[in-house]
């Protein structure tokens, strides 16, 4: 199980570095990459989900390793008991599905809270971007996903431009999305090229390294974090569920002039309805103090197999 996941991680890392290399964004040029992991909640055209959310989290490329480790540490005790790899997807964790059915409601709530708490505990700060659409307010169902992608991409592009304007910090961006449908992947990449080279409603994308990358959510915990963010934003708008929203709201990216990383298309009556939301029946659980870890035993040096023939000339 771990070997298969390691293989997926290696492939994802290769894709990301290949994109950065193709765009010539090496450190020697003074550039580095911000990765925004995105996922969605709700289904365009589904009357049972009146809202659609595309949301995710932006992290500096050198943060992703540590974020993966922190999220792995949340899942590990549950995986040991389940005997298999568990994804940190918010909906199955809440509904007790996809391997989470053997755990109590309190345990699942603690795991869900710990996932969102990654936003609070990470330094430098993580930035959240989201587009929320009330489906009744869009003229065509087919426009919902492209509209959400356009506004999130535009906001992320503005975020990178603002970093340069304020801090003289040249950064480039890359989207990593959950690989769900091949047709959606092709459509998104084509749409991104149009926004970059032709333009969108507010201009052109200027700070992206490449077209978006798509990865199986099993290969990276960061897409699972994006899933949790999208899910709890969706719950806030559709169910007036205030359990996860207060943890996410402070982390919407600041874009200057009062603008944030949150974009909303709502029925005029919806803000008043949201204002009536009540505190959750089951409060957000506090963090569990980490037990002191014993010193790790010294591991013997690994003897790597010799791959060259005896007497081969090796020129490093």
Show where each model-derived region lies.
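Phosphate-ester processing/binding pockets and catalytic centers
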Residues: 2-316
